[in-house]
Amino acid sequence: MNVNKTVTIMLAAGLLMTGNVVATNKPAAVFTPEQEARIGEVAKDYLLAHPEVLIEVSQKLQAQQEQQQQRAMTAAAVQHQNVLLNDKDTPSYGPADAKVTVVEFFDYQCIYCARLAPELEKVIRANPDVRFVFKEFPIFGQRWPESVSAAKTGLQIWRQKGADAYLKYHNAIYATGHNEGKLTDADIRSAAEAVKLDASKAADVQGTLDEINLLAQQMGFSGTPALVVLP
C-alpha cells in the first residue's frame, strides 16, 4: 500500500490539553518583585473580568492537541498497516481485495461500543464491497472478566467457524444489551452455541489478545471504540 494514501482515524477518547513553550533568542525582561506582583494582579483582574479569554485559549490548545494526536495516529496507522490489515488471527468480514477496510478496536462491555454496534451492523450490510476487521480489545477485563471471556470466545469462533459465524456471534453479544458489567457467561455461551462452537476444540487465543493489546498501545489507543479506515 502506498504510504502517502490518506488514513482516517476516529476514536472515542478524552484529550489532554497541554501548552506550548516557545524559545526565542531575545533576552528576557527583568522585573522587580513588586513589578512582578503588580503584573500578576493585572493579569488576574483581566481574566476575572474576561473569562471568555480562558475559554478561547482552552479551545485553541485543544484544537492543537487534536491535530497533534491525529498526525501521530495517522503515522502509526501507516507504520502498522500490515498487521492492521493482514493478521490472519484477527476476525474480518468482507472481500479480501476490498478497496476500503475499516478496523475496529472494541470491548463487548464498552457502552459506547454497544451504541456503535447496531449502526456499524447497518454499514456492513449496506457496503458489501468494504472489509471490516475486528480487533478484540477487552480493556475492561480486569474489572469485568466477561470482557476477556467474550473476546476469547469470538477469536475461537473465528478460527473454528470463520467470518459468517464470527459476525453472527459478535452481533448477538451486542444484541443482549448487556454491557458495563452486565454481560454474563450465559450470554456468551448462548451466542457461541448458536454458531455451534465446539468448546472442546477451542484454541488458545491469549497470544492474539496480547498482540492486539500491544498494537493498540502502538497506535496510541487507550479507550474504545477506536476506528481506523484504510484505503
Give residue ranges: language-model regions.
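Gram-negative bacterial Sec-dependent N-terminal signal peptides
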Residues: 1-22
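Intrinsic low-complexity, intrinsically disordered segments enriched in polar/basic residues
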Residues: 3, 18, 67-69, 187-191
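Extracytoplasmic thiol/disulfide redox context detector
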Residues: 16-143, 204-223
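Cysteine-centric redox/oxidoreductase cores and disulfide-bonded domains
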Residues: 64, 139-231
